Amino acid sequence: MNYKEQVIGLWSDMNKQSWNDIHRYFDNDAVINWNNTNERFNVEEFVRANSEYPGDWSIKVERLECIENLVISVVKVHLKNDDVSFHATSFFEFNNGKIKLLNEYWGDDGKSPQWRIDKQIGKPINYI
């Protein structure tokens, strides 16, 4: 399985909330950083943080790029039975066929700030 396929598999297992399958993608001493909240996890902590996250969600991969041993993904995470959604941009660095380092950047989806709406700066991405 190439790096891109591994990231697709990881997101698929995350979407299914198959927590016992997540470890196989990571090196034993992998580091996972959630940069927005200044948190660093090992694999066990990463799985626990995700498995204990409240609610049920769906994950859709919107973009995937691969540059040598680096895979960059953009996913949309939507909480089922709720209007809440997020986007995550993730940088997966591989070593010896496993994820060695993962840096993730999360953002809440929402409408534009009122000051930009008032000034009529920009328009919705899906305006057609």
Explain the meaning of each model-derived region.
Residues 1-128:
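C-terminal and inter-domain tail/linker signature
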